[in-house]
Amino acid sequence: MNIRKPTDYTAMFAALDALMAAQLPQMELYCEIGRVVSGRSEKGAAVAASEYLQDTYPATEGFSPRNLRRMRAFYMAYEDP
């Protein structure tokens, strides 16, 4: 049986709230969300971030788990060395 330990995402959620409040251009926002999600090595970080963003900011679209994984891939492809 595979049991996962509960993971604390409060720091990630706080970083996401700060990004949403910063009123960044969309491309920069997506890159920064990718940075925040890529900083978490746990499996399920993109899903947790997606659920949080969709619940907290229901008027904003584009935060599905698949899109957050794409944001992470975008950040990892174009991050500054």
Say what each PLM segment does:
Residues 1-81:
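Basic, low-complexity intrinsically disordered segments
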